[in-house]
């Protein structure tokens, strides 16, 4: 356009969905520059935003427009000429407030510009009507003076000039009337479009309320799900503790099974040893029998010793002869007795060990 912007900010741009008139459709993928401009040629104010090479907002501000804040960072206005509703999402509430204040200022300036334009049109129309009314009176006055020849000779250049001016004024008056009619039609169209946009704005406000309710429901659902997740996490913690206990129990079971296997090996060894016990018992009985036989032999030998002593006492003669033999015999007997005692001690020890 060539003019410098009056005010510039950055925001995310949205447009109302033309089919539903409820949902917002993003017009920019990211925050873009949004500016107020004054169009000198048309004596109007515009809001313009460009995303790359694409013009996403070209809205002429009229005195009937209203900028509405729908949240802390979002505002919207209806453009009847574009037959749509624009929405702007700002990064802060302060930016939204500045944009809304500038909108009010520009709207007031647009109203003053419109009033001045209407005053000029009315002044031009009144001037045309006055000029049209003066022309017949001048012609009548000129026809009163002199004869017809004099009127023809003296008034001809003036009549021609007045007639030409009158025709121009009539054309201007006709064009002015046509423009007034055109503006009335355009005004009616704007009123109807404004009514439709007002309805769309009300529906949009209702939709915002519905979104707020849905957001509240979603937030409650989110809180409920968060509580459920915390419960599940707590249950998972209990499950992990149970798993750890199960792992410890499995480890203990494995240790007990190892001990059982060791005990089974010991029991198996004891069973093998128990199979040897009867053999040892039979050997013990055999040794006992031998011991009894040895004891009997010992008893017999003792009897013989007593008998021999008696014989010695009875016959000292035989004592000298048999002394050496008896001494050797006693030595042999003592050795056998010692062996017998050693054998008995070994047998007793064996019985104790078993």
Curated annotation (Swiss-Prot):
Coiled-coil positions: 92-120, 160-329
Subcellular location: Cytoplasm; Cell membrane; Postsynaptic density; Synapse
Subunit and partners: Isoform 1 and isoform 2 encode coiled-coil structures that mediate homo- and heteromultimerization. Interacts with NFATC2; interaction is reduced by AKT activation. Interacts with NFATC1 and NFATC4. Interacts with DAGLA (via PPXXF motif); this interaction is required for the cell membrane localization of DAGLA.
Database matches in PROSITE patterns: WH1
Domain WH1: 1-110
Tissue expression notes: Constitutively expressed in the adult hippocampus.
Short name of one Pfam family: WH1
Region (Disordered): 114-163
Family, as annotated: Belongs to the Homer family.
Location (main, coarse): cytoplasm
Domain notes: The WH1 domain interacts with the PPXXF motif in GRM1, GRM5, RYR1, RYR2, ITPR1, SHANK 1 and SHANK3.
Organism: Rattus norvegicus
An MF annotation (GO) of this entry: protein domain specific binding
GO terms of biological process kind: behavioral response to cocaine; calcium-mediated signaling; G protein-coupled glutamate receptor signaling pathway; negative regulation of calcineurin-NFAT signaling cascade; negative regulation of interleukin-2 production; regulation of G protein-coupled receptor signaling pathway; regulation of store-operated calcium entry; sensory perception of sound
Job description of the protein: Postsynaptic density scaffolding protein. Binds and cross-links cytoplasmic regions of GRM1, GRM5, ITPR1, DNM3, RYR1, RYR2, SHANK1 and SHANK3. By physically linking GRM1 and GRM5 with ER-associated ITPR1 receptors, it aids the coupling of surface receptors to intracellular calcium release. May also couple GRM1 to PI3 kinase through its interaction with AGAP2. Isoforms can be differently regulated and may play an important role in maintaining the plasticity at glutamatergic synapses. Required for normal hearing. Negatively regulates T cell activation by inhibiting the calcineurin-NFAT pathway.
GO cellular component terms, semicolon-separated: apical part of cell; cytoplasm; dendrite; glutamatergic synapse; intracellular organelle; neuronal cell body; plasma membrane; postsynaptic density
Name this polypeptide is given: Homer protein homolog 2
Tree of life domain: Eukaryota
Keyword terms of this UniProt record: Cell membrane, Cell projection, Coiled coil, Cytoplasm, Hearing, Membrane, Synapse
Residue ranges, compositional bias (Polar residues): 123-146
């Amino acid at each position: 356009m060539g003019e410098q912007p009056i005010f510039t900010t950055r925001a995310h741009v949205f447009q109302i969905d033309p089919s539903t008139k409820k949902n917002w459709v993003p017009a920019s993928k990211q925050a873009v520059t949004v500016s107020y401009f004054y169009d000198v040629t048309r004596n109007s104010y515009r809001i313009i935003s460009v995303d790359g090479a694409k013009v996403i907002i070209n809205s002429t501000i009229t005195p009937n427009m209203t900028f509405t804040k729908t949240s802390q960072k979002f505002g919207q206005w209806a453009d009847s000429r574009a037959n749509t509703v624009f929405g702007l999402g700002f990064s802060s509430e302060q930016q939204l407030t500045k944009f809304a204040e500038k909108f009010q200022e520009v709207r007031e300036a647009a109203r003053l510009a419109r009033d001045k334009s209407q005053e000029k049109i009315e002044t031009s129309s009144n001037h045309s009507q006055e000029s049209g009314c003066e022309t017949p009176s001048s012609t009548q006055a000129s026809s009163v003076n002199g004869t017809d020849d004099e009127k023809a000779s003296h008034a001809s250049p003036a009549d021609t000039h007045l007639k030409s001016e009158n025709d121009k004024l009539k054309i201007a008056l006709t064009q002015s009337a046509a423009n007034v009619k055109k503006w009335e039609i355009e005004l009616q169209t704007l009123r109807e479009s404004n009514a439709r946009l007002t309805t769309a704005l009300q529906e949009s406000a209702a939709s915002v309320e519905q979104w707020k309710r849905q957001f509240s429901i979603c937030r409650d659902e989110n809180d409920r799900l968060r509580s459920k997740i915390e419960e599940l996490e707590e249950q998972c913690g209990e499950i992990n503790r149970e798993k750890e206990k199960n792992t410890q129990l499995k480890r203990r079971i494995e240790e007990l099974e190892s001990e059982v296997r060791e005990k089974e090996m010991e029991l198996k060894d004891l069973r093998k040893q128990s199979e040897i016990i009867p053999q040892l018992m039979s050997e013990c009985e055999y040794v006992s029998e031998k011991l009894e036989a040895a004891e009997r032999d010992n008893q017999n030998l003792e009897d013989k010793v007593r008998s021999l002593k008696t014989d010695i006492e009875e016959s000292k003669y035989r004592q000298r002869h048999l002394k050496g033999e008896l001494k050797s015999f006693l030595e042999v007997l003592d050795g056998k007795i010692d062996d017998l005692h050693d054998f008995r001690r070994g047998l007793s020890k064996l019985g104790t060990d078993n």
